[in-house]
Amino acid sequence: VAYIDVVQGTDLWLEYRAPLLSASVAASAAGLKGSYSSRNKCWEEYMGKKKEVTSFMQFGTDHEQDAKHDGEIAIGSLSHDVGIYIHPDHDWLGASPDGKFIGLGLHEIKCRDTEPYAGISPQHMAQIQVQLACAEEVKCVYQSWTPLEQRIWIVEYSPEYWACLFPLLEEFWEFVLSKKKPPQVRPRRVIPVEPTTTLFYEGAHDGIRA
């Protein structure tokens, strides 16, 4: 696995990440239904348009360590910090999961101030599958966290899902390289594959955060 050992959130991390199609924007890049933004908006950001930091994004940044701690208690293992994974066959594709449980898989955290997600959205599923492909892992711990409770799923890598998603990412990246604005995707696309997911935990947090 091609791997860059760098601390997430630092200027160096941003520098290494800038020339990559990141897992976090995979759904938007692919034009998927349920993605955070459109394919055109995603392309504009790669062309230099400043990305807006929403209150939801800031909430996630502010509470990620609390969430990681609660996830570790629920899983019963430490989530180790990671840098950037580069896809072994496609060096333009990268991912920075929120952590990695040794012997179990990657760790992806989503923080909310209302209630945990009831399921895994197309936006997050695309992100997870890209992370797994880049890291050559087969499972990811997906944690939907709120200050009072959480839900945690184990998500498995799906070659069938990847076979549908990857051509869409490759298509988008060609528009980035050529600096040619992509046509709008209407209606938004749907990946006709549901990767295997298992609900691992749901309920209030166990233990007390420091």
Ranges and model annotations:
Residues 1-66, 74, 186-210:
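Charged, glycine-rich intrinsically disordered N-terminal tails and low-complexity linkers that flank
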Residues 69:
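Binding-site signature for planar aromatic cofactors or substrates
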Residues 73-183:
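Nucleic-acid nuclease catalytic cores
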